[in-house]
Amino acid sequence: MHHTERQSKDRARLEVAKKLGADHVIDVTKEDPLARIMQITGGKGVDVSLDCTAGAGTIPILLGIEALKRKAGRIVVQGEMPEFPNFPIGKMTTKYITMHSARGHSYKACELALEQLASRRFPLDLVTTHKFGLRDVDLAIRSVGNKDGAVKDVIHASLMPWL
């Protein structure tokens, strides 16, 4: 499992990724992510690329396409962008890349997530770094988005109605 972060605010996330079992983490503020991926994989690249960078623009998707060195690899994107100028369709075709769009979740995905939570396999308390009451929903949202006037270093916020 590889975990790549794109912003300096994500250093705490890199540490959590290590604790949750990531084999490698890449801080893109300190190293070239593609070069590091190629080093980790012995120049082979990855079989699957997951774009989990909501609102990050096109760069993470382009990185994923470049990192897919094996023909017939797969890339999973959130697809939040209304447009993608100069999308590298030729490279997708040449490499036989299949693109999957992940938006929302299914009933089965919720069941699997609940099973993971119940298994206590991962210390998920490391991921939920802050708890907010309902009166602080706006602050919670701004904090997760790292907005001005927000709480710093929030990886994930949980809303607790009784707080």
Identify the residue ranges that each predicted region occupies.
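Residues in the short beta-alpha loop(s) of Rossmann-like NAD(P)-binding domains
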Residues: 9-10, 81, 105, 159
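Short, structured coil segments at secondary-structure junctions
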Residues: 20-21, 71, 95
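C-terminal hydrophobic helical "lid"/dimerization subdomain
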Residues: 31-32, 62-65, 107-163
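Rossmann-fold NAD(P)-binding glycine/threonine-rich loop
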Residues: 78-96, 108-113
